[in-house]
Structure formats: structure tokens, C-alpha cells
Amino acid sequence: MREVRIPAFAKINLRLDILGKRGDRYHELRTIFQTISLHDELRLRTSRNPGISLTIHGNEALSREPASRNLVYRAVDALKRELKIRGGLEIELHKTIPAGGGLGGGSSNAAAALLGYLRLHRKRLAFERLIEIAVSLGADVPFFLFGGRALGVNKGDELYPLADIPKHSILVVAPRNIHVSTPEAFRWAQAPLLASVQSRQLTKSPDNSKLWKFCALCWSAQVGGLSNDFERPVFRRHPRLATLKRDLLRAGATEAMLAGSGSAVFGVFPSPALARRAAVGFPSDQTFVCETISRERYKRLVQTAL
């Protein structure tokens, strides 16, 4: 039996703008993704038993759900069909990233499963096709094939890699008793419906692709500091998350913000020692001291798998 172990890193959004609701029921986004060192681990091994088995450690709720609903299972199943690979597979998912925290754990697991499965079977797949499969699993999944820092546009699924930033120390605080549904958070945001002419202007086509990319990258160059359009509506319904942000700033964070649609909140600290010291002030919550992680680690994973 062959076995592959692969990390699945979490992400934070350094900026997240909700431009409006599109005609296809999705929202038009502009966001800057950044991977952080907090991660889950996947172990994939070939098996003589037919089918795909998935065992989840570290998250009891996820382990009780039908395996076929899990993004890891769906990712491997899609790739198995694409490559027409026979034979069974055993997957172990060791969870550390809090579920439902806005840290991209499920999407990262799916991307890691795609890369790990390719490596396990020593297969290659055109990167464009791999992206298509990733998009079919979720809007955030393609980002985790790149890692580092990237601009996400459209639904967040069209990506433009950005230059990596210097390493920053991060403290993630995840409340144990607050869970935010992403669809609910979008409803709370009450984004305006984009007019059809606006939708056409925001949609990339062969005719406007170069201009569209230029405008998107100009947007990323203009923004500065942390910003998240989910904060106001989510904080209104969960005031404790606003308190966590305030407490992070009081504990020495230079900046703090809601992670994605929540419910985790993160702070940027001058050093790991200060982040660890601040973590002591959140005894009832899950805390993770980590750091931003460059694209290089992802680059090694992609080059090995493809």
C-alpha cells in the first residue's frame, strides 16, 4: 500500500468586499486571500477494499455526517472518475482548523485531497482541468491550489496571485459556542442586486479579459489595511465577536478582523511571543498562534502532484 500525507492550510481574508448580488444568485466579490500556518492533515493510502473510506479525527460533528457529503470525499471521487482509476482508497482527515470559522478548512481539505490523490497515483492532470474540478467543489477551493497571497474576484474563484508579504504573527480566536452560516451571513449583508448592465461589466469575456484583469489588479493595489464587509452585519447579530476583536486590539494586536464570514476573529501581532501572551486572555475560546505562509510551500505541493 502506498501512502501520502499532505497538510491543508487555513486562510484569512485580508480584505473582503461584497459588490452586490448577481443574477445567478451568487455575490460578486473582491477579496485578498492569505494562507496561514494553521492546518489540518490528510493521509491517503491505497486499499485492497473497493470504494472510498473516510475517517475524521478531531471533529465529532463532522465524523457523524455521511462521508459522501464531505468535500474531501467529493474531491477524490471526482478525480477518481476523471482519471478512471480503479481500486480502493482510505482517507484519514485530522482536523485542527475550526469548522465554520471562516478559515476555509473545508475548501482547503478538498484542494489537499486533489493534490494528494494525484501524488498518490503519480498522475498528471492539466492544471486548467484541475481548476475546473476545484471550482465545481466550491468557490474557495481553487485558491488552495496556489496558496500564499492572491486576489479573488467573481465569486472569489477567479484568482490572480499577488506578491507575498513579509511573515506576520497571527492569533486566531474561535469561539466554541458561535457558528455563522455563510449563506446567512450573505443574507444579513443585504447586498444590492446588480443591474444587468453592471453584471455584464463585471463579467470577464474574451473581449475584455485584459482590461478586466488590469482593473482587478488596480483594485488590489489601492486597498490598504484590513477590511471585511461581513463585519457589520455579523457583529450586529453576534456582539461577542465584536468584543473579541476589541479585546485582540487591547491585547496588542496591530490590526484585528473577522475571518471571512466568521465566526473566528484574528489579530496581527508584532511577534509570536506577544501573540502567545495575548492568547492567555481567551480561556473559554479556541486559540491558535500561527503565521502567514508564503506561496512557496504550496508551489512545492503543486509541482510534486502535477
Predicted features and spans:
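Conserved protein kinase catalytic domain
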Residues: 15, 33, 73, 114, ...
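ATP-binding N-lobe of GHMP and related small-molecule kinases
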Residues: 1-101, 118-131, 165, 174-178
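Conserved, helical-rich catalytic subdomain that frames metal- and/or nucleotide-binding sites
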Residues: 144-146, 151-255, 270-283, 288-306
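Contiguous, small/hydrophobic- and glycine-enriched helical/loop subdomains that border
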Residues: 88, 110, 114-151, 155
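Glycine/serine-rich anion-binding loops at beta->alpha junctions
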Residues: 92-121, 139, 254-269
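Short, basic/glycine-rich phosphate-binding loops at helix/coil junctions
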Residues: 50-65, 113, 135, 216-227
